[in-house]
Amino acid sequence: SFYNLTIDNALGVTLSSTQTIITNNLSINSGKIFKIEAAKNLTVTGVISNSGGNEGFILESNVAGTASLIHTTLNVPATVKRYISGNAEDWHFLASPVSNQVIASSSWVPAGTYGNGTGYDLYVFDEPTPCWVYQLNTSPTSTGENPNWPTVHPTANFVSGRGYLYSVQASNPTNQFAGNLNNGAVSYAVTKNSTLDPLLIGFNLIGNPYPSAIDWKASSGWTRSNLLDSGGGYDMWIWNPATNNYGVYNSLASTGTNGISNFI
């Protein structure tokens, strides 16, 4: 642990300890780089000052896991990498841990010709329809049962708290989000408007907006009173690409189904 930590090494600094706590401030000087290794955890209870921009603070990710940061400072620029495990063409749920990552021209958007080994697929779920809406569907015609992307996702950036469905033609790529880290309360409006399929009414795709895991079993830190009560708790569904099916975890349960844990 450290009281204060200042990154001023010309070669950069890499944090490799499993759990590190900085009890006061972290400062990253201009032109310097501070990396948190994959599967390592950093907590900063004071202020983070990053003069190195997105490239100066990097959270790594690989097959071992993803770096975690718990902090309280607003608008910290950083690059958060995400290792995508599984086979080519598997589907994954994801969300952005930064507030200002532009979707277009990022490593997450559809590119190339689907099926040639270079393409990506990106969708959002539209509960009122209900249907999956493709990022490349920018047709000027948008109907109630077949909305286009600009209708359901009018912003250019990933939306904090919104979940996305993602597939890639490569095996185990590492993509990244770059921008200001989300911090504090994040609100995302949910809907219960679907009339076309009663089995899907009220299902919304929500994502973890932070650069650290969140615990579905935690009794505080949430506002979930508008969710459907299930045995006194709340159910969440997560897609498991290894089994090609959803798993369910109830906030009062000790285990989930289909390999799903309580950590998002």
Positions of PLM-derived features:
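N-terminal exported-region signature
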Residues: 1-17, 21-264
